[in-house]
Swiss-Prot record:
Alphabetically ordered keywords of this record: ATP-binding, Cytoplasm, DNA damage, DNA recombination, DNA repair, DNA-binding, Nucleotide-binding, SOS response
Pfam family of the protein (one): RecA
Name the record gives this protein: Protein RecA
SMART domains tied to this protein: AAA
Localization of this protein: Cytoplasm
GO cellular component term, pick one: cytosol
NCBIfam families: tigrfam_recA
InterPro entries, per the entry: AAA+_ATPase, DNA_recomb/repair_RecA, DNA_recomb/repair_RecA_CS, P-loop_NTPase, RecA-like_C, RecA-like_N, RecA_ATP-bd, RecA_C_sf
Amino acid sequence: MDDNKAKALAAALSQIEKQFGKGSIMRMGDGNVEKDIQTVSTGSLGLDIALGLGGLPRGRVVEIYGPESSGKTTLTLQVVAEMQKLGGTAAFIDAEHALDVGYAEKLGVNITDLLISQPDTGEQALEIADMLVRSGGVDVVVIDSVAALTPKAEIEGEMGDQLPGLQARLMSQALRKLTANIKRTNTLVIFINQIRMKIGVMFGNPETTTGGNALKFYASVRMDIRRTGTIKRGDEVVGSETKVKVVKNKVSPPFKEAHFDILYGEGVSREGEIIDLGVDHKIVDKSGAWYAYNGDKIGQGKDNAREFLRANPALAREIENKVRVVLGLKELPVDGAQPAAAEA
């Protein structure tokens, strides 16, 4: 760059910093730009791997959507629990007025420290979210759900009033305000969303999410969660087999999938994932119905192997760390606990 151009640029940069504050513009090579994106685990090892960074990125908007009873709130509460384990503060904006506190506690959420709001209108919910984000004191904000963010005009109107596009405009305005503050305060904001059917669609996917298109654009990560089957013990249904597809990812390659089990009253089965991923990467041996690790049998059938790993957390952590090394993720600290002997 010649001297005149360099002087003109320096003057412009100086004026920008003077007018908008230091850090409003900078060179990428200055070292002040954050290169490593901080993440928080989803509570599912397979999903952390599918996301590419080892979890959900902080300072970004995330959307989790799917049909009813597919595990959207369960997955989100697991993220809240993981953030609290890291010493973070979480807020849950319960627009649906349907949060099961007992279930959240079973998933590992510290209810005492969880901030909860049950707003009356969509405007109130999004304003509360914006104030929490701007404070910089909250690490994760969950909005459950976009479909329940009812505009004030709709609540105050008559049943049957036609108010087209009102919720979409509300979401668009809120996200324009939220995005800059989310990045500045490094807050993770998760929107839970529902699925609707587009009427009259002959070709292509008739499914769409509520709240217009703004969230689709502003979200750095979008995840489609589906229940693919049931888990039974005898005749009793004890959980559901779940598939999550990362349909959008601005921080890593998208379109990856994760498969895991959600056990009722327990959440994502970490031990089940460790077994499946261990088998996939030849760390755990599977012969018929038996599972073995380092030549030692750990259980006949997945249920027994899962229970064995639950009883031996040090062994589970050892297998998980081997999986993490293979996949290029950071290892977790190992406890000093010794594994018990497996029962034949």
